[in-house]
Amino acid sequence: MERRRLRKDIRLNLYYPDWDSRANHTELYPQLRVITSQPIGHWFGSSPTKPTKRVKSRVHRLCRRAHPHQPIIVIYSIPNRDLGHYSRGGHKEEKSYLKFIREITAGIGDYNPIIIFEPDAIPHISNMKFEDGFRRLQLIKKSLQILQRCNGRVYVDMGNPKWLKPNQVKRYIDWINEPIDGFVVNTSNYWDLKTCHQWGDKVSRMVNLHYLIDTSRNGVGSLGTDDWCNPPNRALGVFPTTRTSSEYCEAYLWIKVPGESDGTLNGGPKAGRFFLEQALSLIENVGR
C-alpha cells in the first residue's frame, strides 16, 4: 500500500489534561506541577497483575474529553512485551491482542489523537529468534491495518538512536508496508536532541516519513547505552512543542510520563510506578 507522503503542514493541537492524577504529591511538592501541567502520553496496556478492561470506553472518554485537542495515546501491550524484562506483560496471545487493537480503534473513531504504537516492539525483534520476530512483524502489520480504520495519526516506535541502524529501520518499514504517519525516536529514553536528530533525519530521508522525539527526560542526555533504568541526575527535556530544529521532526513530545520508574534499579519501584525522587530530580536538574 502507498504510504502517506511527508507533510510539512502538520499542526498538532495537544491536549493538556485538566485533572491532576498526582494531587496528593503536588500538594506537598508544588514544583511537580511543572510535569502535571504538560500534555503527557496516556498509556494503554495489559500487565500480569492489571489486565486491560473497558478499553473502548476508556479511549473514547479520553478522546471526547480532549476534543478538539489531541491526546497522546500510547499502545503498549504486544505479546511478550519487553521480552520479559522490567515492563514485561502484554497480551498472552495474538487473538486477544488484535481484539484490544480493535477496541482502541473503535474508541477513537473519528477523533484524531496522536497514537504511539508499541514502544520497543520493533527494536526488540533484533533480540528474538527469527520465527518469533517474523511472527511479531506479521502481528504489527495486522494491527496497523486495523488502526487505519480510525482517524488517529499513527507513529511507530523505532527505539533510541543507539539501538537500530537506519538501514534496519528501513527494512522493517518496507516489510510492514502499511501507510503510517511516521516513526518515534527515544521513547522512554534519555538521548540528547542532537543525537536523536542525527539518527532521525537519516532514517527520515531513507523512508520518506517524518518523526517525533520523546524529550520527557533527555534534558542532559544519556549516561550511555547500558544505563537506561532510572539513571541519576537526569533532567526534563524540551517541553512539548511543534517548534523543532529539524525539518523532518514534527514535534517534541513527552511520551514517557516523567517521574514514572523504568524498573527496580537505582532505587526505583516497579516499572510504571511513580518515583517521587526521580520526578523531583528531573525538575531540579533543568538547565544545569
Language model feature labels by segment:
Residues 89-111, 119-151, 166-168:
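Active-site cleft segment of glycoside hydrolase catalytic domains centered on the general acid/base Glu
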